[in-house]
């Protein structure tokens, strides 16, 4: 796609904001193809961030005042443009949701769930039931696994060796 083509319809002679096709209003996705960027129209409706309604964008909204700023609570601007000092937010524990500590320091250890074994009472870094990704058994890791896994060569497709050990010449 050349730089003077419309990003909505791909034709020359106008820009996307003036596109007569009315496709999408800038919601299209560009995908990388062999010939460069190609436009794929998206059926997602336009949603106004000012009022939350679909069918138009904030610049076309009848509602003049934005929703309240997340920083100061007043309307007319968004948090990134707020003139008030940035409000400090206290970090909360992901385990119990209370402020003042992080999950790794949580007193509610019996409620902590391990992402490795799925049991309660500890977190993954403290898990004693390590799981081998090679054989799927618990109690050891892959480097210490006694079960050999079948390896396949990416060069020739045969099993039993890796590409770096392959005797077949690489084709360009």
UniProtKB/Swiss-Prot annotation:
- Keyword Lipid biosynthesis applies: no
Q: Where in the cell is it found?
A: Nucleus; Cytoplasm; Endoplasmic reticulum
Gene Ontology CC entries for this record: cytoplasm; endoplasmic reticulum; nucleus
Per the record, the zinc finger regions (CCHC-type) lie at: 4-21, 46-63, 67-84, 91-108, 112-129, 130-147, 151-168
In the record, biological process GO terms are: positive regulation of cytoplasmic translation
Domain of life per record: Eukaryota
Keywords annotated in UniProt: Cytoplasm, DNA-binding, Endoplasmic reticulum, Metal-binding, Nucleus, Repeat, Repressor, Transcription, Transcription regulation, Zinc, Zinc-finger
| Record-linked SMART domains | ZnF_C2HC (SM00343)
Name a GO molecular-function annotation: DNA binding
State a single Pfam family of this protein: zf-CCHC
Q: State what this protein does.
A: Single-stranded DNA-binding protein that preferentially binds to the sterol regulatory element (SRE) sequence 5'-GTGCGGTG-3', and thereby mediates transcriptional repression. Has a role as transactivator of the Myc promoter. Binds single-stranded RNA in a sequence-specific manner. Binds G-rich elements in target mRNA coding sequences. Prevents G-quadruplex structure formation in vitro, suggesting a role in supporting translation by resolving stable structures on mRNAs.
Summarize subunit and interaction data from the UniProt record for this chain: Associates with the 40S ribosomal subunit, the 80S ribosome and with polysomes.
- Name of the molecule in the record: CCHC-type zinc finger nucleic acid binding protein
Gene that encodes it: CNBP
């Amino acid at each position: 796609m050349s730089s003077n083509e419309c990003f909505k319809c791909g034709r020359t002679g106008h820009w996307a904001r003036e596109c007569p096709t009315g496709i999408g209003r800038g919601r299209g996705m560009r995908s990388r193809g062999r010939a460069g960027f190609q436009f794929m129209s998206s059926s997602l409706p336009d949603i106004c961030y000012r009022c939350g309604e679909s069918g138009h964008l904030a610049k076309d909204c009848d509602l003049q005042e934005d929703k309240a700023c997340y920083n100061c609570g007043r309307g007319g601007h968004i948090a990134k443009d707020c003139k008030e000092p940035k409000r400090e937010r206290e970090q909360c524990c992901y385990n119990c949701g209370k402020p003042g500590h992080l999950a790794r320091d949580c007193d509610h250890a019996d409620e902590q769930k391990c992402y490795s074994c799925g049991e309660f009472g500890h977190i993954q870094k403290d898990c004693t039931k390590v799981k081998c990704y090679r054989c799927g058994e618990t109690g050891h890791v892959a480097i210490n696994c006694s079960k050999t896994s079948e390896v396949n060569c990416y060069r020739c497709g045969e099993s039993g060796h890796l590409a770096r050990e392959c005797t077949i010449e690489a084709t360009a």
